[in-house]
Amino acid sequence: MNIRPLHDRVIVKRLEEETKSAGGIVLTGSAAEKSTRGEVVAVGNGRILESGDVRALEVKAGDTVLFGSYVEKVEKIEGQEYLIMREDNILGIVG
């Protein structure tokens, strides 16, 4: 992928969600919720503070992250769906 997000934006590839319930039932269509877990594929240079300084982002390419269900932008790049969000939308880094 040949794209670099600006400022505090992060590009995330959504990871596939389990399609089976805890009881072993296969979920299809609207019953299977979209995953709120993904892999960071690119990050911007950081957030520009009021002082003009740049605060580096805490996430980096390769991190597995949890994010809120609202995503700023969904974009197809080279046939693959990516999520473009601000670092503030990321709730945590997994493991």
Curated annotation (Swiss-Prot):
Its main location: cytoplasm. Keywords: Chaperone, Cytoplasm. One of its GO terms (molecular function) is unfolded protein binding. InterPro entries: Chaperonin_GroES, Chaperonin_GroES_sf, Chaprnonin_Cpn10_CS, GroES-like_sf. Pfam families: Cpn10. PROSITE patterns: CHAPERONINS_CPN10 (PS00681). GO terms for biological process: chaperone cofactor-dependent protein refolding. One of its GO terms (cellular component) is cytoplasm. It is found in: Cytoplasm. Heptamer of 7 subunits arranged in a ring. Interacts with the chaperonin GroEL. NCBIfam families: PRK00364.1-1, PRK00364.1-2, PRK00364.2-2, PRK00364.2-4. Together with the chaperonin GroEL, plays an essential role in assisting protein folding. The GroEL-GroES system forms a nano-cage that allows encapsulation of the non-native substrate proteins and provides a physical environment optimized to promote and accelerate protein folding. GroES binds to the apical surface of the GroEL ring, thereby capping the opening of the GroEL channel. Belongs to the GroES chaperonin family. PANTHER family: 10 KDA HEAT SHOCK PROTEIN, CO-CHAPERONIN GROES. This is Co-chaperonin GroES. It comes from Pseudoalteromonas translucida (strain TAC 125).
